[in-house]
Amino acid sequence: MKISALVMITLLICSMMILCQGQKILSNRCNNSSECIPHCIRIFGTRAAKCINRKCYCYP
């Protein structure tokens, strides 16, 4: 049981590190993720975008 909990915590930490390293934050204000897509395509060349806390986040 302790080993499985340790493995789950390790996977969680690794996945958070991967997402943090890959994301790029834009200063654009947004209300939904579809508003971020044109900006991410123009600046970074990627369509993977999310609007979190009224900021655009672009992912590779």
UniProtKB/Swiss-Prot annotation:
It is found in: Secreted. Disulfide bonds join 30-51, 36-56, 40-58. One of its GO terms (molecular function) is potassium channel regulator activity. Expressed by the venom gland. Keywords: Disulfide bond, Ion channel impairing toxin, Neurotoxin, Potassium channel impairing toxin, Secreted, Signal, Toxin, Voltage-gated potassium channel impairing toxin. The keyword Signal applies. Residues 1-22 form the signal peptide. It holds the Pfam family Toxin_2. GO terms for cellular component: extracellular region. The record marks 50 as: Basic residue of the functional dyad. The record marks 59 as: Aromatic residue of the functional dyad. PROSITE patterns: SCORP_SHORT_TOXIN. Belongs to the short scorpion toxin superfamily. Potassium channel inhibitor family. Weakly inhibits Kv11.1/KCNH2/ERG1, Kv1.2/KCNA2 and Kv1.3/KCNA3 voltage-gated potassium channels. This is Potassium channel toxin-like Tx677. It comes from Buthus israelis.
